[in-house]
Each structure stands twice: as C-alpha cells, then as structure tokens.
Amino acid sequence: MKRYRGWAVLLIVAVSGCASHMGSSESAGLRSPSDAAAIRAVFDMTTAGWNRGELPVYLSAYTESATAMGRNGPERGVNAIGDQMRAGYWKTGRPAQQLHYEHLEIRPLGPDNALATGQYVLTGGGLPNRTGWFTTIWTRTPAGWRMIHDHSS
C-alpha cells in the first residue's frame, strides 16, 4: 500500500507540473511580455499591408529562407511564398479579398522562438468568404520577430 501511495504522490506532482505549464500565459518563456505583443503587432502590420494591396509589407513578416506549407505542398523562400500569394489570393496586383485574423494565440518555444496559431478570414471582393487555420513558427531576428514557417489550411 505504501508503495502505491508513493507512486500516487509522484503522479500528482507530475500532473500538477503539466497543468501549471498548460495554464501559463502566452508570454511566459519569452524574454518579456512585450515579445508576444511584438508578434501580435507584426500580424497587425501584415494585415494592414495586405488590405492596402502592399504585398511586400505582408511578406516582410517572413525570413528570407522561410517555408510555407499550403495546399500544393511546401514553398521555400520568401519569393516563392510571394508567388504563392499572388497566384492564389491576388488579382490585378491587389488582394482579391480583405484579410483579418481571429483566435490568435501565441505560445513560447523558448526565449527566442514562438508558436502562433489562429484563423485567417478573407472577406469581400464579391467572392465567398474564405477561412482557414494556421500555425506559424516565429524567431527573434535583428529586425524583430519574423516567421520561419507558416502552415495554413
């Protein structure tokens, strides 16, 4: 019986540690709470750039060697990602629809990396609304937080 009690205590401690980790704030593990805010600011900047028809502003969130996983498989490099965006979401040099994000959640992957998940929503342009979910991996660079991988579906 004592042997089982020891295992029960160990199990409770382990579960408590997992529960406290799962309930941590989005900025825990990053260098400062402002890091999560900085990543959110990049999302805001890219949304504004997209909606103004400035694809280079949208693409500035990616590192040069970023990868993006879309319905046609992986694209490597920011230029290929730009080509993918132009082919699937732009018409005559402008976005076919307006972009916004919902359910954005940022979780730390250490002091210099983060995971962002959420939903993108494309509306307007006389087209049916399009929406999907994404996971992006971010890294701290000298230029600020940038995406190294984007998986959208």
Model feature map: region roles:
Residues M1-A8:
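Bacterial N-terminal signal peptides that target proteins for export
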Residues A8-G17:
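Bacterial N-terminal signal peptides
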Residues C18-S60, E64:
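Short, low-complexity N-terminal intrinsically disordered segments enriched in polar/charged residues
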Residues H21, T131-S153:
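Short beta-strand edge/turn micro-motifs at domain boundaries
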Residues P33, L55-D112, V121, L127-N129:
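A solvent-exposed, acidic/Ser-Thr-rich amphipathic alpha-helical stretch
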Residues Y62, Y120-L122, T136, H151-S152:
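Short beta-strand segments enriched in hydrophobic/aromatic residues
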Residues I106-A114, T139-G144:
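A short, structured loop/turn motif at beta-sheet edges
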